Amino acid sequence: MIKRLLSFLDASPVNFLAVKNIADTLAANGFRRIDPALPLGEVKSGDRFFVTKNDSSIYAFRIGNKPIADAGFHMICAHCDSPTFRIKPNAEMLTEGGIVKLNTEVYGGPIMSTWFDRPLTLAGRVIVRGEDVMQPETLLLHIKRPLLQISNLAIHFNRQVNDGVALSKQKDVLPLLGQITSQLEAGNLLMNVILEELNSTIADCQFCAKDVLDFDLYLADATPACTFGVHNAVSYTHLTL
């Protein structure tokens, strides 16, 4: 069970991916996806259904064997997102030495200090042109290699680092993406990463920059979930604070 949980967490760093993975599991276990805009049709005891909304939430239910007035019903709720940093549009910020950082905004209420000095990556969704110009397509993206880092200054530049330092959401937690090596990369580094990932993971597709209409991407922990302790009784998952 714990291995299945850790595998699910590794595959679900953001809500879009969590919803897809939950939907796949439900479908494999006899649940039927429904469209809330269409009639449900005949329903009988034991039938199982699920519906998704905006690719970011999912609702599953099973029809009971007794009337609700007699047996009542049970409800279980959980959220499938977690505090993180959302990548802003036109996010690339070129700094001294050709270093590129990404401009972000806080999503939720993260404990910002826990995001420093660890390998991070990107996950979310990318909207691309569809065959019908009026029907764009949404693709999920999860870059599984370490890609970014939010770095602390060396201690001789920040002697108060161990005394508790107020962090600016606009300045101190901008992740480093890399260094441009040619003028052609200026302003295109993030897009190149997105296109490389899409073209390497989606068969028979060759996207270019003009195909990408928008994206909704977030920072995610690149460290795999694991267990630890003498008896492996404690689990380390991902940044969720």
Pin down the residues of each PLM region.
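N-terminal capping segment at the start of a domain
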Residues: 1-16, 170
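Soluble metallo-hydrolase cores and metallopeptidase-like ectodomains found primarily
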Residues: 18, 54-60, 66-68, 129-130, ...
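A generic, well-ordered mixed alpha/beta core segment in the N-terminal half of proteins
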Residues: 72-159
